[in-house]
Amino acid sequence: MIIYFGIGTNLGDREANLRTALSLLDERVGQQLASSSIYRSAPQGFLSDNEFANIVVAYHTTYSLEDLLLITQKIEQEMGRTQKSVGGVYYDRIIDIDLLQAIHNSSFITHQSTTLTLPHPRMQERDFVMIPLKEVEDILNSK
């Protein structure tokens, strides 16, 4: 399965936060296939003076979607994230790792549970996801 993650940060050394998250994903998820360049954006859905740095990355993995969610939540915790966005209330964050979409045998996987929905239900509304996602898809399609 190929899993696409969206990673964002708007606190501290944002580029270092992205590197750390990528390193931890590399260790725990599987083979990294492609990563976008950094896309900078203003916060969406809340007020903050802190600009976001965002990337999208694709991995080949054998983990289940629910296991991947647990892995990403553990990485967020280890990196110091203390508040999760709940009910449409968003906060500044040192790291945010979202599962965006998954592909198996050239078909998109749809998944709905109490903890995870794929494809990500709001990714189409977010340039900070769609622009780097297109970059990653272009890289993968050129291989």
Where are the language model's segments positioned?
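Flexible, gly/pro- and Lys/Arg-enriched active-site loops
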Residues: 13, 44-52, 63-69, 73-143
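Anionic group-transfer/hydrolysis microenvironments
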Residues: 8, 56, 98-100
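Short, solvent-exposed beta-strand edge segments and adjacent coil->beta transition regions
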Residues: 2, 52-56
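"…together with the soluble PPM/PP2C metallo-phosphatase catalytic core" -> "…together
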Residues: 59
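N-terminal beta1-alpha1 ligand-phosphate binding loop
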Residues: 1-29, 36-43
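A short, local hydrophobic-aromatic micro-motif
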Residues: 33-36, 95
